[in-house]
């Protein structure tokens, strides 16, 4: 029976907030977001600060791995060349930021890169946090930027909090020189990171036969604009939308469908939040890409759409719509997982 790598999370990478380090070089904030496939509300983040040389090293390592995979249908993303003059110009900094972000996002649909030791080592030193705990309730003011340490920990001065801690980088350099047979003791932060970048565990493949492309009726369930004229939605979907209009206030009805009636106005007659329109646009394009066979683009579109839904749903004033958005996000996550296993693994 075949075995496949186990990955319980969908990932979303961003590279942002370039700043000048006190030593003179530019560093970038790298955020890795892990969204649980079982519970879309279970989101974890790892944040590290990296410089151009770190990205260039990762690019070389991953390019070597990708070359040995003999994947001819996709081109490994290029990375900006190093330069001595002009590297502090805004255009150069933006080019490097964009190149680094494209590199990280390229790894998402390739398990050999997504779970590579080099990628895990790249995020070594980052702390695993749960952003949903900070923004889960918008009626409560967010916590201060500088959390109060426990009594048994020394207080960090405000002007020191933005400086990157040198210890993880130094320790990482020492680990590369150490003999693998005698690794340093793992810390709780390292164990949490290892669980997210778990490239060693395997699970039995499902005994059911692999599903082929979805039928038109099934695709209609994922089509944000399936109510448009000429779209030809299935009778089942028409019935669902009719029930939605007739009983939008009932808790047992699905309160939100991208592009549907419930999105137009909320309970108080105000326009629906902007995040729904943004997510609808992304998911619609993902559907079109999937129909056209552009599976990497479709996967990215579903992931980006779900990312916007999960970021916007805590601030939605409608409790019924919040529940509907969560259900739809789970459906799109499931579809993204199917695309990954059926077409990109």
Swiss-Prot record:
Residues 272-345 form the MIT domain. Residues 141-151 have a biased composition (Pro residues). The modification Omega-N-methylarginine is found at residue 105. Transmembrane segments: none annotated. Keywords: Methylation, Phosphoprotein, Protein transport, Transport. GO terms for molecular function: phosphatidylinositol binding. Gene3D superfamilies: Phosphotransferase system, lactose/cellobiose-type IIA subunit (1.20.58.80), Phox-like domain (3.30.1520.10). CDD domains: MIT_SNX15. Residues 1-130 form the PX domain. The modification Phosphoserine is found at residues 208, 234. Residues 133-163, 226-274 are annotated as: Disordered. May be involved in several stages of intracellular trafficking. Overexpression of SNX15 disrupts the normal trafficking of proteins from the plasma membrane to recycling endosomes or the TGN. PANTHER family: RIBOSOMAL PROTEIN S6 KINASE, SORTING NEXIN-15. Belongs to the sorting nexin family. This is Sorting nexin-15. The lineage of its organism: Eukaryota, Metazoa, Chordata, Craniata, Vertebrata.
